[in-house]
């Protein structure tokens, strides 16, 4: 598994990006309309990314998206529907990233 989108029906609860994910080119995982962007920049040593600004985009935000990076160890994450029903439990390892988008969540270290 490199990238896994976890849904409850049509509702995206989270996206998990495992440490093994190594794109060969610059790639953004999240769609442009997301308030939180996750991207991987791939360039050769010495390459410069020119200073730039992101254009202002007016958005309506419902909820609080979170990005968690597992720096060490393992974490068991349980993802819940908006009705507080368990959808799935996953193990995240060192180097994994999870973007929590909707629904609920709990953690066990």
Regions from the PLM with identified roles:
Residues 1-44, 50:
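A short, N-terminal "cap"/entry segment at the start of jelly-roll beta-barrel domains
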Residues 11, 18-19, 55-57, 93-97:
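A short, sequence-level motif marking secondary-structure junctions
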Residues 30-37, 51-69, 85:
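A short beta-loop-beta micro-motif enriched in histidine and acidic residues
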Residues 42, 69, 91, 99, ...:
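Well-ordered beta-strand positions
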Residues 43-46, 53-56, 80-82:
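Histidine- and/or cysteine-centered catalytic micro-motif in compact active-site loops
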Residues 44-45, 63-80:
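Glycine- and acidic-residue-biased ligand/ion/polar-headgroup-sensing regions
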Residues 51, 77-78, 98-100, 104-109:
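Short beta-strand His + acidic residue motifs that chelate non-heme Fe in jelly-roll/DSBH
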Residues 81-102:
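Short acidic-glycine-tyrosine-enriched beta hairpin
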